[in-house]
Amino acid sequence: MAELTTLARPYAKAAFEHAQAHQQLANWSAMLGLAAAVSQDDTMQRMLKAPRLTSAQKATTFIEVCGEKFDAKAQNFIHVVAENDRLPLLPEIAELFDLYKAEQEKSVDVDVTSAFALNQEQQDKLAKVLSARLGREVRLHAAEDASLIGGVVIRAGDLVIDGSVRGKIAKLAEALKS
């Protein structure tokens, strides 16, 4: 995974810098999201691996599949990525682009997994507290996992806060073993 991220980083950075300079972050995020989804299609993956097709043919086919969703700059970007045989990296490029975008917008996606469903008031309160702690706008994504027994697990980028009963039991069991 780290190697793919390393290979994708210069493309994501270039796309981000272009989109930021032209105030098109949302458009480029959508275009790269579409490109990532298209590149993960089984038929498209077979086409991208076809040794008989040139990089120009792969790029042209890729752009045709996406229809008119790509502007001229995005089409040029796809051609450059294809020339370097990096079209399979589009999901990583899109993910890195979105990270750069979130960093620039001072926002963060936070995944909250709880043992029981959180109502809207609880989600709003949690988002407010996390926003104050992280110093960013929080986009909360709530999920439910009964195996947690109780409490919540919060994931925001590299930060993980495990306040679940299952996590506490696991820590206690580890402490008893040592």
Swiss-Prot record:
Keywords: ATP synthesis, Cell inner membrane, Cell membrane, CF(1), Hydrogen ion transport, Ion transport, Membrane, Transport
Cellular component, GO annotation: plasma membrane; proton-transporting ATP synthase complex
Record-level Gene Ontology MF annotations: proton-transporting ATP synthase activity, rotational mechanism
Entry-linked InterPro entries: ATP_synth_OSCP/delta_N_sf, ATPase_OSCP/dsu
Localisation per UniProt entry: Cell inner membrane
Gene3D superfamilies in UniProt: N-terminal domain of the delta subunit of the F1F0-ATP synthase (1.10.520.20)
Topology of the protein relative to the lipid bilayer: Peripheral membrane protein
Family: Belongs to the ATPase delta chain family.
Job of this protein: F(1)F(0) ATP synthase produces ATP from ADP in the presence of a proton or sodium gradient. F-type ATPases consist of two structural domains, F(1) containing the extramembraneous catalytic core and F(0) containing the membrane proton channel, linked together by a central stalk and a peripheral stalk. During catalysis, ATP synthesis in the catalytic domain of F(1) is coupled via a rotary mechanism of the central stalk subunits to proton translocation. This protein is part of the stalk that links CF(0) to CF(1). It either transmits conformational changes from CF(0) to CF(1) or is implicated in proton conduction.
NCBIfam families to which the protein is assigned, alphabetical: ATP_synt_delta, PRK05758.2-2
Protein name, UniProt field: ATP synthase subunit delta
Provenance organism: Pseudomonas savastanoi pv. phaseolicola (strain 1448A / Race 6)
Taxon lineage: Bacteria, Pseudomonadati, Pseudomonadota, Gammaproteobacteria, Pseudomonadales
